[in-house]
Amino acid sequence: MTEPSIDIPKESSKSILFQFVLFPLGIVAVGVGIFLLFGRLASEEHTIPDYLNEIRAGSSHERWQAAYQLSKSLKRGEAKRYPNLEEQVASIYRGSKNDDPRIRQYLSMVLGTIGDHRATPVLLEALNDRETETRIYALLALGELKDPAAVPRMVEAARDGDKDVRKTAFFALGEIHDPSAVDVLVSGLEDRVADVRWNAAIALAQFSDRRAAPVLRTMLDRTMLARIPDMREDQKEDALIVGMTVYPKLVGAEARPELERIATSDPSLRVRDAAKQALAALR
């Protein structure tokens, strides 16, 4: 596992799962650096039509920056103020196939936030893109759309040769929660890459399928985590916390011995606190 995890926020288990399982280094680095490098767009007052116009007609740098700002500015439900927004964004998306890939990547986020299933075919087409990160963003957006029609193609993505694509596909399939994905989620439990297995197990656990339990339990085992090449200490803590979020919900009181062990003996205060919270939730 070579990509770093993002700093994990304290707000909710949902945030922890989302932040931990996704975003390889290239995506994170771009997102973190944008405000430092390109503050002009952020500091000016822009409306959604302004961003759309800049994406259409700006310079190469201005276009992807505007796409990023639009993805950050648009709130779920706000699209109702702009009846043709999905159509406009989808049109720009289709026309930007040969442009800076960041334009399509950030517009994928916009389409996901809009939440209109008419965007599903556009995003499914993006799963054929040569850019790995573009495929990842499209999968994330499809997970947000929760359109069952996307599941067959996303199942194919779960068998992709790139581990980050597989990882994201499993996460997004869990978001859609369509029973037709269960078989591929089960197959993902045997993936050769640890965090791909974890994503498959996390998604499968949402179906209350106990076949996910053995893989989830490995996330609570520091000895097992120590065998994963290049895994940093903070990533190990992240895995433990995510595992303690999901595993007890699946197996109930069976998780108590593991949680008690972690709560009393883990070297990380952050992990011990998470174990105590998980124990309290069992009571």
Set out the residue ranges of the language-model regions.
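Hydrophobic membrane-insertion alpha-helices, especially the h-region
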Residues: Q19-G39
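Acidic, Ser/Thr- and Gly/Pro-rich intrinsically disordered linkers and low-complexity segments
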Residues: R102, L220-A239
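Structural signature of alpha-helical solenoid repeat scaffolds
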Residues: S71-K72, G112, G143, G174, ...
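Amphipathic alpha-helical scaffolding segments comprising HEAT/armadillo-like alpha-solenoid repeats
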Residues: L41-E54, R76-G95, D116-N128, D147-R159, ...
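Extracytoplasmic/periplasmic/luminal assembly and interaction segments
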Residues: R56-S60, W64-I114, K163, F171, ...
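Short inter-helical turns and helix N-cap capping residues of alpha-solenoid HEAT/ARM repeat scaffolds
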Residues: G58-S59, D99-D100, R130-E131, G161-D162, ...
